[in-house]
Amino acid sequence: MLINYTTKELDLLARIMRAEALAEGNLGMLMVGNVVINRAIANCLTFKDIRTITDAIYQKNQFTGTQSSLFNGTPTTLEKNLAQRVLRGEYYHPATNSLWFYAPPTNTSCKNTWYDQNLAGRYKNHCFYNPDSGVCVELY
């Protein structure tokens, strides 16, 4: 286990994974889960005061999925199982050390940097970005 969490936070993680990446499939949802957990364990940049899954998901202006109808409702058994896998420490490239992701417009490449962060890679329609290793040592 990478971080302490409650049953409510397991459900919350499953719901944000669904809301942000349902169209990206199971692997895409797992990668979004990686970003959420990374934000909760990183003690750097704009995540210095983020310590829990709840803090990470509800941090102001971060996850637009919280405004989606997909965020509401009970997560499915599959979605909970995916969230549990992330909580057990399963990481997937390019989200392994990522703190950010976004979906560029259709048929558009990922930017090499996004808010001064380096592109780690792309999965389907999500571009993932890593902080420098010397800045967020908890992630490396």
How would you name each of these model-derived features?
Residues L2-Y140:
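Bacterial extracytoplasmic/cell-wall-associated proteins, especially those involved in peptidoglycan
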